[in-house]
């Protein structure tokens, strides 16, 4: 199989990895209520935090990020950078639209970071710093993610990573789409702040 022919395979493998709903799995194993029935209904770490279980939220964040990192590292090792980017896109789509949960998944922030970490780690550091700075000043997880993801493609472009910049521009658009309800709540002043329980 040629390297270019591997791209669809990388996309599918990435999707399958990304579609593993770690937030839902961890909260069920811990005996908490269905994470989809509280807060934003998302299966991601921020919504898991609303259960009051910080350890579960941290575990969800780590495992969701690893989905993106593992996908791009494995695909890149097998078939090069284009396959890595395809796997990253697949992992992101899998997390947002998992077939096992009727295509209703998470918001994609942790996976976004994990993909960045696997493809160009300095950008992941910048993303996290931007997220932390925004979260510290506003205490809005959603706004922090929107700000950090908006700047990430420009950061990649500035340092000459044009293909990565294009990929993350697409991922940022998808992330904004996943946060569309959060954006509405931010505009109306009804968005939950970090640490608030459901």
Curated annotation (Swiss-Prot):
It is an enzyme of class 2 (transferase). GO terms for biological process: phospholipid biosynthetic process. Pfam families: G3P_acyltransf. Keywords: Cell inner membrane, Cell membrane, Lipid biosynthesis, Lipid metabolism, Membrane, Phospholipid biosynthesis, Phospholipid metabolism, Transferase, Transmembrane, Transmembrane helix. Its EC number is 2.3.1.275. It catalyses: an acyl phosphate + sn-glycerol 3-phosphate = a 1-acyl-sn-glycero-3-phosphate + phosphate. It is a multi-pass membrane protein. GO terms for molecular function: acyl-phosphate glycerol-3-phosphate acyltransferase activity. Pathway: Lipid metabolism; phospholipid metabolism. GO terms for cellular component: plasma membrane. The chain crosses the membrane at residues 6-26, 56-78, 83-101, 113-133, 155-175. Probably interacts with PlsX. Catalyzes the transfer of an acyl group from acyl-phosphate (acyl-PO(4)) to glycerol-3-phosphate (G3P) to form lysophosphatidic acid (LPA). This enzyme utilizes acyl-phosphate as fatty acyl donor, but not acyl-CoA or acyl-ACP. Belongs to the PlsY family. HAMAP family: PlsY. This is Glycerol-3-phosphate acyltransferase. It comes from Bradyrhizobium diazoefficiens (strain JCM 10833 / BCRC 13528 / IAM 13628 / NBRC 14792 / USDA 110).
């Amino acid at each position: 199989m040629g390297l270019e022919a591997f791209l669809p395979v990388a996309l599918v493998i990435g999707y399958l990895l990304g579609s593993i709903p770690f937030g839902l799995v961890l909260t069920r194993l811990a005996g908490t209520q269905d994470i989809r029935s509280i807060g934003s209904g998302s299966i991601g770490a921020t919504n898991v935090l609303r259960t009051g279980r910080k350890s579960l939220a941290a575990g969800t964040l780590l495992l969701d990020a690893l989905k993106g990192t593992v996908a791009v590292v494995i695909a890149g090792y097998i078939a090069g950078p284009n396959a890595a980017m395809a796997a990253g896109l697949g992992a992101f789509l899998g997390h947002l639209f998992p077939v096992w949960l009727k295509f209703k998944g998470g918001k994609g922030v942790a996976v976004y970071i994990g993909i960045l970490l696997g493809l160009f780690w300095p950008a992941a550091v910048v993303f996290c710093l931007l997220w932390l700075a925004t979260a510290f000043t506003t205490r809005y997880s959603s706004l922090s993610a929107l700000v950090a993801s908006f700047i990430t493609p420009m950061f990649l472009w500035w340092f000459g990573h044009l293909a990565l910049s294009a990929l993350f521009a697409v991922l940022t658009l998808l992330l904004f789409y996943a946060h569309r309800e959060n954006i509405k709540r931010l505009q109306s002043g009804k968005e939950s702040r970090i640490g608030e329980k459901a």
